[in-house]
């Protein structure tokens, strides 16, 4: 990461990550959902968060749309803005993970290079969940009506229509929302996480 300011230094806190995780009784981790719009990322992530909450786990869900209302409100959907959207979000996720929180993020994050940068930043704390769903199924769901707008030319650079989605090469978890129920998808994720979040 290129830091423009040259007169700053990193200050170490007296309370470190290990102490925070011990206090919470859990390990901080980032569960990064990626997939087309309408694939079911937010639905599965919300159910996952509720299940973890009911298990007594401290979580935080960063939804791609919600983050664009605040932190990333000055970004559009050009390739450059999408890259910056993911970069900023990854840095926030890193802070949450360092605080011992099970962090769940739901971003289309269509570019492999961007996701690889998040993986590099988080290291062993990064779990990529690819929400696999055929484009035609996502379009038929179209909960926000945005595929229709994209097909009508009202939205430019829309992932899956006139901007590519690069399928992950080797995600930790793949869930198929056109084949499995939300509960089945969540169970699959929880099975994978069972040994990772336990302190």
From Swiss-Prot:
GO BP annotation list: hydrogen sulfide biosynthetic process; sulfate assimilation
Highest taxon in the source lineage: Bacteria
Gene Ontology MF annotations: adenylylsulfate kinase activity; ATP binding
Active site, UniProt feature: 109 (phosphoserine intermediate)
Positions contributing to ATP binding: 35-42
Keyword set, alphabetical order: ATP-binding, Kinase, Nucleotide-binding, Phosphoprotein, Transferase
Cross-referenced SUPFAM superfamilies: P-loop containing nucleoside triphosphate hydrolases (SSF52540)
Catalytic activity from the UniProt record: adenosine 5'-phosphosulfate + ATP = 3'-phosphoadenylyl sulfate + ADP + H(+)
EC number: 2.7.1.25
Enzyme class: transferase
Family to which this protein belongs: Belongs to the APS kinase family.
Record function comment: Catalyzes the synthesis of activated sulfate.
Protein name as catalogued: Adenylyl-sulfate kinase
Organism classification: Bacteria, Bacillati, Bacillota, Clostridia, Eubacteriales
């Amino acid at each position: 990461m290129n830091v423009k300011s040259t007169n700053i230094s990193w200050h170490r806190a007296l309370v470190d990550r290990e102490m925070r995780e011990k206090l919470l009784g859990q390990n901080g981790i980032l569960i990064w959902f990626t997939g087309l719009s309408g694939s079911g990322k937010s639905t599965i992530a919300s159910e996952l968060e509720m299940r973890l909450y009911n298990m007594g786990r401290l979580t935080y869900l960063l939804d791609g749309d919600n983050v664009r209302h605040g932190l990333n409100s000055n970004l559009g959907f050009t390739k450059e803005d999408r890259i910056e959207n993911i970069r900023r979000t990854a840095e926030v996720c890193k802070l949450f993970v360092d605080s011992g929180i099970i962090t769940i993020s739901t971003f289309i994050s269509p570019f492999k290079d961007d996701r690889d940068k998040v993986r590099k930043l988080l290291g062993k704390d990064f779990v990529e969940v690819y929400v696999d769903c055929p484009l035609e199924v996502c379009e038929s769901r179209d909960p926000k009506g945005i595929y229709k707008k994209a097909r009508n030319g009202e939205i430019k650079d829309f992932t899956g229509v006139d901007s590519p989605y690069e399928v992950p090469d080797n995600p930790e978890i793949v869930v198929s929302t056109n084949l499995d129920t939300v509960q089945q998808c969540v169970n699959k994720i929880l099975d994978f996480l069972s040994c990772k979040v336990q302190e």
